[in-house]
Amino acid sequence: GVDCIVSGAGLPMNLPEIVHKAEEVLAASGIRRATKLVPIVSTRKALDVIIKYWKKKYDTTPDMVVVEGPQAGGHLGFTPEELDSYTPASYDEEIKSILSKTKEMQIPCVVGGGVYTRQDWEHYADLGADGVQMATRFVTTEECDASMAYKQAYIQAKKEDIVIVKSPVGMPGRAIHNVFLDKVRQGERFMRGCRQCITTCNPATVPYCITEALINAVEG
């Protein structure tokens, strides 16, 4: 019954098909839904690929687009080399290119990744963004349902504690340094079964399940 699905950690190429099948099941029960589809992209190239594929195969387009830049937390849609090469100014050019496409198609576009202050929001508004996505800013609030231990890790983190890790998903990710990451770097494995959540993950070789790790983190 959700109103929209925001999908990232890879290109959601078959998202329209998955949602359409779910809507058909609901329709058979007399429930009519029109779920909005919102892909997360990091480059104009990724957006072009999604738009072209969705239009050709499903005759549909995104209802909104979220752009996540190289300063975002969690999974990042960049290679390690790209993370090193992008500057705020050079990534602004990427954002402008994405915005030119979304404006052309009259699709709202929201920018995220390193958005923390009013000045950040005003900067992206000046570029033409319709809104901003903010997550880290609100993790430590009372309204966030994460554990206090999880929130405390954010509060106590210093700049040097923020590290880039290689996720089992196959993408780089930004995380807070902790004992768990030290153990992974030392070669320990924490696989206790596979949830089959991501096709690019090989449970025989990855050191841990990303879904389990995220759940354990938020639960403290």
Residue map of PLM features:
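Active-site entrance/lid segments in N-terminal catalytic domains of soluble metabolic enzymes
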Residues: G1-M105
